[in-house]
């Protein structure tokens, strides 16, 4: 069964086709083999965690490692950061457009509460500590995160910052009456991620 292409694998293939055409076949094979190995090593993870592993974390690691065969480590990191950033900018545009619907912005903190509980909960490898979840405020400290843990486990903790940055790009300035705040992230070396989305 052919694996579904993620945005990261698609962008990786585009990079190697454009920049390294002579080695594209070899690089694509190396990427596919590494991703298959990573998926096999994490096959026993919960269904909830698999969602994050398959969609972003493992393709990110495979792309980052494979690109280092043909470019310096820092350039490989910036290249993968570019992939993640591009998706975050698209997501920001779509969300901001949706929030043009009058009054819809007021629902955003509540949506964050629900999605944290369903997609970013303990079953997926996160450890959220809810500080405030009502009256137009979503404030959560994330004490553990599979993006951070998996990147660190595979020796590339610096890669996690791509995913941290994507949150800031996606959620900053969505609407004049919504405030996104975060001063710390596990991926940037802090002991927690202090998330907050609130109605002004």
Question: Model-found features: residue ranges?
Answer:
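Generic structural motif
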Residues: 3, 126-130, 180
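N-terminal, charged low-complexity regulatory/assembly segments
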Residues: 1-67
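Unusually extended, aromatic-enriched hydrophobic runs near protein termini
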Residues: 49, 98-125, 173-198
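Amphipathic interaction/junction segments at domain boundaries or subunit interfaces
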Residues: 55, 66-155, 159
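C-terminal non-catalytic interaction appendages of large macromolecular assemblies
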Residues: 136-141, 146-150, 154-200
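Secondary-structure boundary/capping signal
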Residues: 24, 75, 178-179
């Amino acid at each position: 069964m052919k694996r579904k292409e993620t945005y990261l694998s698609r962008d990786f293939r585009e990079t190697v086709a454009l920049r390294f055409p002579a080695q594209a076949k070899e690089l694509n094979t190396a990427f596919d083999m590494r991703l298959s190995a990573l998926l096999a090593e994490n096959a026993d993870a919960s269904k909830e965690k698999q969602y994050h592993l398959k969609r972003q974390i493992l393709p990110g690691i495979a792309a980052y490692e494979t690109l280092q065969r043909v470019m310096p480590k820092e350039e490989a990191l910036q290249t993968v950061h570019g992939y993640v950033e591009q998706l975050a900018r698209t997501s920001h545009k779509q969300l901001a457009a949706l929030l043009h619907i009058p009054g819809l912005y007021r629902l955003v903190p509540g949506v964050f509460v629900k999605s944290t509980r369903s997609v970013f909960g303990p079953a997926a490898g996160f450890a959220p500590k809810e500080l405030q979840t009502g009256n137009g405020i979503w404030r959560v400290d994330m004490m553990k995160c599979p993006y951070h843990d998996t990147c660190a486990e595979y020796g590339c903790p610096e890669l996690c910052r791509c995913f941290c940055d994507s949150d800031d790009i996606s959620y900053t300035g969505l609407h004049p009456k919504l405030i996104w705040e975060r001063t710390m992230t596990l991926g940037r070396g802090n002991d927690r991620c202090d998330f907050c989305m609130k109605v002004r």
